[in-house]
Amino acid sequence: GYSEEENRADPQALADMLQVIYACSKPTVARVQGDCYAGGMGLVAACDIAVAAEGIEFCLSEVKLGLIPATIAPYVMRAMGERAAHRYFLTAERFSAQEALRIGFVHELVSGDELDAAVARLTHHLTAGSPHAHDECKRLLREIGGETIDAALIADTARRIGEIRVSPQGREG
């Protein structure tokens, strides 16, 4: 058994790691080459972009083990959407890479042999962008996702583009 302290430390370590990945100022790409279960789905969901090999399966298996996917839930729910999360959190059924693509959990499916090339192509596009713009873009995505489009949000987004246009990186680009 675990001590109470150990019981809290282990999930906290996973939560901290997922937050570091999610909040990283650099774009992150998940390369999924084999079946992806439970905490592995949290790792994929915490990344900005996910590319997976065709033919693999995904599963949020926690309820079959008497657990809940609490630590990974914020990331997985954002990646797959709330309705899909209801289904897959509660049923713990395996689903295909094609289904993961359909629900938006992954962005692209390729054959296993093409996985490295697909990731290389994405990283080529990413490295063409400004690191400062990537950081600000990621901040924008985190902060306005799910917000109501109202006058305050419109003013905030206008302020953001105005600020980055006059930054050294914005003037250079």
List each language-model region with its residue ranges.
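Hydrophobic, secondary-structure "cap" segments at the distal end of domains
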Residues: P74-R83
